[in-house]
UniProtKB/Swiss-Prot annotation:
It comes from Oryza sativa subsp. japonica (Rice). Removal of H(2)O(2), oxidation of toxic reductants, biosynthesis and degradation of lignin, suberization, auxin catabolism, response to environmental stresses such as wounding, pathogen attack and oxidative stress. These functions might be dependent on each isozyme/isoform in each plant tissue. SUPFAM superfamilies: Heme-dependent peroxidases. The active site is at H65. This is Peroxidase 2. Gene3D superfamilies: 1.10.520.10, Peroxidase, domain 2. One of its GO terms (cellular component) is extracellular region. Belongs to the peroxidase family. Classical plant (class III) peroxidase subfamily.
């Protein structure tokens, strides 16, 4: 007969296995409950990105900023809270597109598809709409009832981050160095505000001089002057999802400090070189990293809720 301690251990193992099973996401989650969910999301995203290519980057960023703060739970969509954090305030975009998608999905499947899953699918569809690779999005996330502004301030990478800080930041989310470099490649699309690259323009030496001169015209040195002026993160092909971001780094044309540190004599130099010359390798690493990121601490089963309106709890 088993001892009490061994029975307790067996129960703990069983509970852990059940917990792991419940946390598993599935590519077929909505096949029965809402079979047209993915096609509805894709149509809305494609239309939004075709209308404004920058929106693709904004939707990818929403998913990233969601997953890095208490997991992929759509907490970033709740009004206030995380939206007021330093890395998000005045720069997060795409809420109107998400709201439009949610309205369309609710019309065909009431309270079935989570806002967290909408973000994950919209990120994939945005990349595809801009010519990038596709991947299978695992589904079944549920929406949080809380958000965490303080965690958004501490856990989201800053544009001034050092390489060591970036590696540590991603590692704490279960993402390795290759994941970090690959996910940074999302900066092949989108734009950044002058206030986030001004210091690099005027105070750093590992920047192409012609590149810096061109940017200074729209980003004056005085703080407070032109802070919100925009520049593309990838000046070569700003609206195409490709590997030009890495090629730019090889020429010291990274816009943000946190971009150029990936190629500055450090441990990630070879990965940048590889992704620059081998688009297939970048695409493979990027899609794998997006799946891993999308699996950060999801709410599943009966956890959380399926919000009716992405900006507020039910």
């Amino acid at each position: 007969m088993a001892s009490a301690s061994s029975v307790s251990l067996m129960l703990l193992v069983a509970a852990a296995m059940a917990s792991a099973a419940s946390a598993q996401l599935s590519a077929t989650f909505y096949d029965t409950s809402c079979p047209n969910a993915l096609s509805t999301i894709k149509s809305a995203v494609t239309a939004a990105v075709n209308s404004e290519p920058r929106m693709g980057a904004s939707l990818v960023r929403l998913h990233f900023h969601d997953c890095f703060v208490q997991g992929c739970d759509a907490s970033v969509l709740l009004s206030g809270q995380e939206q007021n954090a330093g890395p998000n305030a005045g720069s997060l975009r795409g809420f109107n597109v998400v709201d439009n998608i949610k309205t369309q999905v609710e019309a065909i499947c009431s309270q079935t598809v989570s806002c967290a899953d909408i973000l994950a699918v919209a990120a994939r569809d945005s990349v595809v709409a801009l010519g990038g690779p596709s991947w299978t999005v695992l589904l079944g996330r549920r929406d949080s009832t809380t958000a965490n502004e303080s965690q958004a301030n501490t856990d989201l990478p800053a544009p001034s981050s050092s390489l060591a800080e970036l590696i540590g930041n991603f590692s704490r989310k279960g993402l390795d160095v290759t994941d970090m470099v690959a996910l940074s490649g999302a900066h092949t699309i989108g734009q950044a505000q002058c206030q986030n690259f001004r210091d690099r323009l005027y105070n750093e030496t590992n920047i192409d001089s012609s590149f810096a001169t061109a940017l200074k015209a729209n980003c004056p040195r005085p703080t407070g002057s032109g802070d919100s002026n925009l520049a593309p993160l990838d000046t070569t092909t700003p609206n195409a999802f490709d590997s030009a971001y890495y090629t730019n780094l090889l020429s010291n044309k990274g816009l943000l400090h946190s971009d150029q540190v990936l190629f500055n004599g450090g441990s990630t130099d070879n990965t940048v070189r590889n992704f620059s010359s081998n688009t297939a390798a970048f695409n493979s690493a990027f899609t794998a990293a997006m799946v891993k990121m999308g699996n950060i601490s999801p709410l599943t089963g009966t956890q959380g809720q399926i919000r009716l309106n992405c900006s507020k709890v039910n």
